[in-house]
Structure formats: structure tokens, C-alpha cells
């Protein structure tokens, strides 16, 4: 996929939603995957997987609050319906190895449901710049 094709698909900006308390760490170290945050703080990523509540990890670059994984846990009894291999823990570990971006700004109602738990920030990132950095990955 070319840079232009990527921008045509996702638009000129992509968005990342994060608790406002994460902004200090993002400024200090950039966006990192939850599993990497766990490793940097000396935890095994499996220790933070399948979180029932938001979990804050503290490393040298500052705190990072990870969202809960209640949607996964709510579907636990039906995991075989959506997992073709592995366990729910395996899936949670895969999700924690990723950073999620949205191709368009979320509806206000979606952001409000997140903010009901904790104040959030919506980060806007240049899609072309993101492609330039990660196209080879």
C-alpha cells in the first residue's frame, strides 16, 4: 500500500483516545503498546491482561493508565464463537501488543461514555506521518 492509498482509506488524520493522565507519559516516551508499558515497568504482560478495571502502571517515563477489558470478559462464555484458536487470554495479549487508532473522530456520545469513567484526551495524528514511520512494519 502506498502513502496516498493509506491516506485515501483513513483520511488525513487518525485519532487515539487515551485517559488525560497518560499525556505526561506520552509526551515523555510517545505512544507505546500496553504490553510494552508492562515490560518497561517490570511486569509480565500476562499480569495485566484481561483487566476488569483500568490499571495504572508506573515506569520511569511516568504513569500509564490502561483501559479495562470488560468487553472481552463479558464475552468470555462465548469465546469459542469468535476465537478460531487460542484462549481469551491469548487474544487479550495480542490486543495489548497494539495501539489503536480511529480513522475518524468518534461520535461525541462515544467519547462521553469513556469520560464517564475518566477524563480523556483525543489525540490527532497526521496519517501520512504515521505511514512514513511505520510503513515497513
Regions found by a protein language model. Give the residues of each.
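ADP-ribose/NAD+-binding catalytic cleft of ART/PARP-like enzymes
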Residues: 1-90
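ADP-ribosyltransferase catalytic core
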Residues: 52-137
Amino acid at each position: 500500500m502506498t502513502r496516498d492509498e493509506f491516506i485515501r482509506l483513513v483520511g488525513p488524520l487518525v485519532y487515539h483516545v487515551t485517559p488525560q493522565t497518560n499525556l505526561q507519559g506520552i509526551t515523555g516516551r510517545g505512544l507505546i503498546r500496553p504490553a510494552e508499558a508492562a515490560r518497561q515497568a517490570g511486569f509480565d504482560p500476562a499480569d495485566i491482561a484481561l483487566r476488569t478495571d483500568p490499571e495504572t502502571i508506573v515506569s520511569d517515563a511516568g504513569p500509564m493508565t490502561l483501559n479495562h477489558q470488560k468487553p472481552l470478559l463479558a464475552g468470555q462464555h462465548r469465546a469459542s464463537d469468535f476465537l478460531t484458536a487460542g484462549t481469551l487470554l491469548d487474544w487479550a495479549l495480542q490486543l495489548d501488543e497494539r495501539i489503536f487508532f480511529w480513522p475518524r473522530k468518534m461520535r461525541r456520545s462515544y467519547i462521553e461514555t469513556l469520560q464517564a469513567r475518566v477524563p480523556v484526551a483525543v489525540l490527532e495524528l497526521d496519517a501520512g506521518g504515521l505511514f512514513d514511520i511505520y510503513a515497513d512494519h
